[in-house]
Amino acid sequence: MAGKPVLHYFNARGRMECIRWLLAAAGVEFEEKFIQSPEDLEKLKKDGNLMFDQVPMVEIDGMKLAQTRAILNYIATKYDLYGKDMKERALIDMYSEGILDLTEMIGQLVLCPPDQREAKTALAKDRTKNRYLPAFEKVLKSHGQDYLVGNRLTRVDIHLLEVLLYVEEFDASLLTPFPLLKAFKSRISSLPNVKKFLQPGSQRKPPMDAKQIQEARKAFKIQ
């Protein structure tokens, strides 16, 4: 029997968090090996474990997969979370890219220089409220199902829930005008595997704090 997937990243959300979410939603147990120093990262590189000398990297089914989208696609396909046909997969990909844009826009605020933070925060709030959330509210209304694509859970439902929780952390009032998204958040959060991942003590990571930012900058040699 194959062992658990092993996730290589630092002990924070970053680009690995959506992978953690997807594995958890699929009911897959996984291990994590945290990068805590530049030496940890260099060892992975020198041992030939990182195809492009970067993380995230996931060991799964005898492979060492790099690149977030490739990892997500493999997990979604393996655990039947990638739609039933090409049209559904195209919608899943399109929606996922928009969700990724929103996730990165919010996530990068913590790294923003102080003199730019106010302007970028205002821009992020504007785009969240007037571009991204209305788009997904419209999808839920027009599709008329419990899920974004088709009539069963797919990876994009998990990605959307994740970013809705980030939006809630960022500014909970941004969700107020979107009743279908609020209902979606409650519905997907209640799924057994997701509910378990949302409980204290899971491998879900909290928002990055100043200490984690400093550790990440050190590990990745970011000035």
Curated annotation (Swiss-Prot):
GO terms for biological process: glutathione derivative biosynthetic process; glutathione metabolic process; prostaglandin metabolic process; response to bacterium; response to caloric restriction; response to stilbenoid. One of its GO terms (molecular function) is peroxidase activity. Glutathione S-transferase that catalyzes the nucleophilic attack of the sulfur atom of glutathione on the electrophilic groups of a wide range of exogenous and endogenous compounds. Involved in the formation of glutathione conjugates of both prostaglandin A2 (PGA2) and prostaglandin J2 (PGJ2). It also catalyzes the isomerization of D5-androstene-3,17-dione (AD) into D4-androstene-3,17-dione and may therefore play an important role in hormone biosynthesis. The modification N-acetylalanine is found at residue 2. Belongs to the GST superfamily. Alpha family. This is Glutathione S-transferase A1. Keywords: Acetylation, Isomerase, Lipid metabolism, Oxidoreductase, Peroxidase, Transferase. Induction: Induced in the liver by beta-naphthoflavone (BNF) and 2(3)-t-butyl-4-hydroxyanisole (BHA). It comes from Mus musculus (Mouse). The lineage of its organism: Eukaryota, Metazoa, Chordata, Craniata, Vertebrata. The modification N6-succinyllysine is found at residue 4.
